[in-house]
Amino acid sequence: MAHALIASPFLDGHLLLKPGARAGARISADHYEGLRQAATSGEPLPAWAMQTASDVWGLDLGGRTAQGTVVVREPSGYGHCRASWEINLGCNFGCKHCYLGERPFSGLGWEDKVRLLDIMRDAGVLWLQITGGEPTMDPHFRDAWQAGMMLTISTNGSLLWRPDLLRLFQDCPPYRLVVSMYGASEASFDTLTQRRGAWKAFRRGLKAAREAGLPLRINVVVTEDNASEAAEMAALADEWNVENHAYTNMTPTIYGGGEPLLAQSAAHLRQRKPFAGCNAGHTFFHADPHAKVSICKVGRDDQIDLMAEGIDGLTRLGTIADRLMLRTGGCEGCALSGTCRVCRPLAKHYQEAKAQLHSYCQHGDKENAS
């Protein structure tokens, strides 16, 4: 029987969650320990847990034992609560704006994938984003769900019609399915993705996912190829009653290539808010398809090979993060660093891509205005 709830440490507290649900409940340390004991010894689900499940999610868990009903995640001394994982690089689309550049289908074998997920669980990862490439081409993430992780799957949606995927997501409901939308017409969609039939596959997948009641969100990707359809894309998402967000500012490839920047719609670019810091490398990390771990998707210098070093390799991430965030290179000594709009790793990518200064640096604003 699939578990109905997850009880987990989270930063300086504890949470009670329902797989696939946006709402959650904070619980006391005593309640967490009580659930932990009940699950270990096969005791009935505590009354407070049954009441919380009823109040928050409308669940009737009367008469259930804690074991099998709740996944109680163990405390971790590593301090990580979120992670992202490129399960593979392969993709059935060839999007012009993709930050991965080349996309060969490569990644870990099944046993090493399970080992990586075990490391993530033991490191404390509760929220896991699985991306690619196209992750639904390689749907080996049931173990992550069974380990009590809240999964976000980032997908192009083209395969969501497949019965095996629909069953997987219904049996193991994700926290969210984030689907990228590349146009509101066949012409623009197929042009940006560089694949004939991509629009039809996207529509087929979205229709099946909506009918299955999956927790969808649409990222409306606005580029030069589909800029004239930006409003129409958002309107379609609204018509489908799917939460949506416009994505307009592209970043260079992870190898420092500027190709994605050429795909941007200049009329739709947004000025970023000042960068106020983040927890990359401290409470969050990113794993590539071969379990090479970095502080995030952007700052990939000094990767740690988890298959070679194991979980203790993560103890070096904080030091790496602090070093990568230093204002070095062309940013060293900048008097405007307090209001800089990008982190140092992202600025480095822009510099390597020889991007126009105003696209990432305040010093370029006057240059662009003139």
Give the location of each predicted region.
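Short cysteine clusters
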Residues: C91, C95-C98, C278, C296, ...
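C-terminal accessory region of radical SAM enzymes
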Residues: R36, M250-K273, K292-Y350
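Iron-sulfur (Fe-S) cluster-binding segments and ferredoxin-like electron-carrier domains
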Residues: L100-L108, R300-D305, S337-A369
